[in-house]
């Protein structure tokens, strides 16, 4: 364990257009090399694509997608008596949001559409319909936790 103080959790400002801290966190996750204006443009254009494709409020579609991606359990490695065990643990609220945003962006970048806006929009739409790679990642994480349920007593 480090003897240094824990870094304080910085408060994120709400997004000016959607008035949501989650959107700001998503923009920060999309951002590469500190280019925030480009990340904002990608997200806002992706939301426009979602609006035209689904004829629904893009914020509602995004929130539904995020709820579908969010993991409830994950496995953490614990060393007990010289053996490493994959111990299933509940995910904290903050980590749930972080993981779901990270997975959404990661699997958007792996898609083969022409622009990042299209990739992100289609991944959000797929996630809201409970399909897509980010949903598969969540299911795989839950399967790992279920398979290692026998080691749940190592949780401390």
Swiss-Prot record:
Q: Which Gene3D superfamilies match?
A: Ribosomal protein S7 domain
One Pfam match, by short name?
Ribosomal_S7
Task: Classify the source by domain of life.
Answer: Bacteria
Per the record's keyword annotation, is rRNA-binding included, yes or no?
yes
Record's GO cellular component, any one?
Answer: small ribosomal subunit
- One Gene Ontology biological process: translation
Per its UniProt record, what InterPro entries does this chain match?
Ribosomal_uS7, Ribosomal_uS7_bac/org-type, Ribosomal_uS7_CS, Ribosomal_uS7_dom, Ribosomal_uS7_dom_sf
This protein's record includes keyword Protein biosynthesis: no
UniProt keyword annotations, A-Z: Ribonucleoprotein, Ribosomal protein, RNA-binding, rRNA-binding, tRNA-binding
Which terms in the Gene Ontology molecular function aspect does this entry carry?
rRNA binding; structural constituent of ribosome; tRNA binding
Signal sequence: where?
A: none
The similarity annotation says: Belongs to the universal ribosomal protein uS7 family.
Any idea what job this protein has? One of the primary rRNA binding proteins, it binds directly to 16S rRNA where it nucleates assembly of the head domain of the 30S subunit. Is located at the subunit interface close to the decoding center, probably blocks exit of the E-site tRNA.
Tell me the subunit arrangement.
Part of the 30S ribosomal subunit. Contacts proteins S9 and S11.
Q: Which NCBIfam families match?
A: rpsG_bact (TIGR01029)
| Name of the protein described by the UniProt record | Small ribosomal subunit protein uS7
Query: What does the organism's lineage look like at the top?
Result: Bacteria, Bacillati, Mycoplasmatota, Mycoplasmoidales, Metamycoplasmataceae
């Amino acid at each position: 364990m480090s003897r240094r103080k824990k870094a304080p959790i910085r408060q994120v400002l709400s997004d000016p257009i959607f008035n949501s801290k989650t959107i700001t966190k998503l923009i920060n996750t999309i951002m590469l090399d500190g280019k925030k204006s480009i990340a904002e443009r990608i997200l806002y254009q992706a939301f426009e694509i979602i609006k035209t494709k689904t004829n629904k409020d893009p914020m509602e579609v995004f929130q539904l997608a995020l709820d579908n991606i969010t993991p409830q359990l994950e496995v953490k490695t614990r060393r007990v008596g010289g053996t490493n065990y994959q111990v299933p643990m509940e995910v904290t609220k903050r980590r749930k949001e972080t993981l779901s945003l990270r997975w959404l962006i990661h699997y958007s970048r792996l898609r083969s559409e022409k622009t990042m806006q299209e990739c992100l929009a289609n991944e959000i739409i797929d996630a809201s319909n409970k399909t897509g790679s980010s949903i598969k990642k969540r299911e795989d994480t839950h399967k790992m936790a279920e398979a290692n349920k026998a080691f749940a007593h190592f949780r401390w």
